[in-house]
Amino acid sequence: MSYYVYILQSLKDKTYYIGSTQDLNSRIERHNQGRVSYTKPRRPWKLVYSEEHQDRSSAAKREYEIKKRKSREFIEILIKSPRM
């Protein structure tokens, strides 16, 4: 079963949100429906980056790696980088 690490960008204030999920489309829909408290006031959101992982553990580790950078510049470089 695949898991995804994703980055959303708010169309309201350009902030980024980083998360992981097993069902990417459903999760994005939940964010845009206001069913996630942190992202609700910043709706709407668009998907700007995603990575597929083979298991939950590796997706969670990657999510943590991205979040611990706490750098908008790093996120924007990641978004612009070619996928392999």
State where each predicted segment sits.
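GIY-YIG nuclease catalytic motif and its immediate N-terminal context
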Residues: 1-43, 50-53, 57-67, 71-72, ...
